Each structure stands twice: as structure tokens, then as C-alpha cells.
Regions:
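Short, acidic Ser/Thr/Gly-rich low-complexity loop/linker segments typical of extracellular
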Residues: 185-198
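Short, glycine-/Ser/Thr-/acidic-enriched flexible segments
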Residues: 2-5, 33-36, 70-73, 144, ...
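Catalytic-core segments of thiol-dependent peptidases
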Residues: 1-44, 51-54
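Short, solvent-exposed loop/linker segments at the N-terminal edge
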Residues: 153-158
Length: 224
């Protein structure tokens, strides 16, 4: 491969426009030479084309891209990064892109311990692998679950609000991030407790309405 894309199987920058994946926007993981070389004369490189693909109303491409920015990577090292990264995600619950990629790179410490000198594999691959996109993005490893959000009537006297967060099966969801927003401003934020409950007090003197959002790994964002 190179900055223009993959050669076997063939998938190049010009092919991105033919994608029709719509809202199913994945993370592209490309353990192929130079496919993430965002400073290359090929502009856009494959990674940039994937991230830029589509429009807000007709999306295509992906939400993030992981790959090397150097042309001279080797399969034996790329495969270690690949294997350790997927092991971290599938077997150890490390689903954020940044930590998962770092886990992949750390595999070279174990598999190639002698490659520790300046410019050798451990240093080289720690520099050339990078993420285009949000490194805190969490990857779905299975069909994501969905929230149900139950809200008790808010008390006008003290702004007391109690929210119950469950999943589709009715199970309580602990440690979900709950954000309450009014006119794009966050007016309260916190985590559900072990019983999936979030309790807060709001200053509702100047609030006509508000939105509640819930987020957690392996869930589609909830909104009410």
C-alpha cells in the first residue's frame, strides 16, 4: 500500500466516493504502509479521504482511521500491532481508540524486545502509527444496546430531579454519564449510581425546557 490506498485487495482514494455505507460509519484500521500519511503529496491520502467522505446529510466513509504514516513498514511488525490491538479490545475491554492503539504498539516490546534502539521497531512504530479522528472514541464490539430513560416530575420548589437509566431489557445501568442541557448549555452532569439512578437539583427559575442525554460504552446515546 501507499498514501493512495490499498493494493491487495485494491481500494484507493478514488474508490471512497463510491461507498454507500450511509450512517454505518466504521473505524478504519489500516495496517498497511503509508495509508495514513497526511503530509504526503497525495492529497488527500486514503485516511483523509475516508474521514472527509460524504456530507452531513449523505454520510459515507468512516469516523476515524488508524494506520501508519510511513511507507516503509513491515508486515511482521504491523501484524503484531494488529493482533495486540484487537486482543486489547476483544479480551480486555480497552475500547477507546487511543489506548487500544497504544496497546497494539506495546506488543512490540514483548514480541521484539531486542528492537529497542534508536530508530528500531519499538521507537519507529510508536512514531508512525497515528489516529485521524477522536482518540477517545469508543468502538462498538457488538450490536449496541439502547437506554430507557425514566424521569420523575421535577420539583418546582427545589429543582429536585430523579432519573432512572435502564437498558432495553430493563436492567439498571450503573455508571452511565448523564448530561442535562438547556439551550446548548450543560446545567447538570454526573454518573448513575449502582442502581442506575441519577439525582440532581436544578435551578429552573430561567429554564423553560431541557434535554437529557445518557452515554456509556456499548450503548447508543440516549436522549429524552
Amino acid at each position: 500500500g501507499d498514501a493512495n490506498g490499498w493494493h491487495y485487495p485494491e481500494f484507493h482514494v478514488d474508490d471512497v466516493n463510491d461507498l454507500n455505507n450511509g450512517w454505518l460509519t466504521p473505524v478504519f484500521m489500516s495496517y498497511v504502509c503509508n495509508s495514513n500519511d497526511f503530509a504526503n503529496n497525495v492529497d488527500p491520502c486514503l485516511a483523509e479521504a475516508i474521514i472527509r467522505g460524504g456530507t452531513p446529510t449523505v454520510p459515507k466513509g468512516g469516523v476515524a482511521f488508524i494506520g501508519p504514516s510511513d511507507l516503509h513498514t513491515s508486515t511482521k511488525y504491523n501484524n503484531v500491532i494488529n493482533a495486540y490491538m484487537y486482543d486489547a479490545m476483544l479480551n480486555h475491554g480497552i475500547v477507546e481508540l487511543g489506548p487500544a492503539m497504544q496497546a497494539g504498539q506495546s506488543g512490540l516490546l514483548k514480541e521484539f524486545p531486542a528492537q529497542s534502539g534508536p530508530g528500531e521497531a519499538q521507537e519507529f512504530y510508536s512514531h508512525v502509527y497515528n489516529i485521524l479522528g477522536d482518540p477517545s472514541l469508543q468502538v462498538y464490539l457488538d450490536t449496541p444496546n439502547e437506554f430507557t430513560i425514566d424521569v420523575q416530575n421535577i420539583s418546582k420548589s427545589d429543582g429536585f430531579l430523579e432519573i432512572q437509566i435502564n437498558d432495553q431489557q430493563g436492567n439498571m445501568v450503573p455508571y452511565a454519564v448523564v448530561s442535562i442541557m438547556s439551550n446548548s448549555d450543560i446545567i447538570s452532569k454526573g454518573l448513575t449510581d449502582e442502581q442506575g439512578k441519577f439525582v440532581t437539583s436544578l435551578d429552573i427559575s430561567s429554564v423553560e425546557n431541557f434535554d437529557i442525554y445518557a452515554n456509556k460504552s456499548a450503548f447508543i446515546q440516549g436522549h429524552k
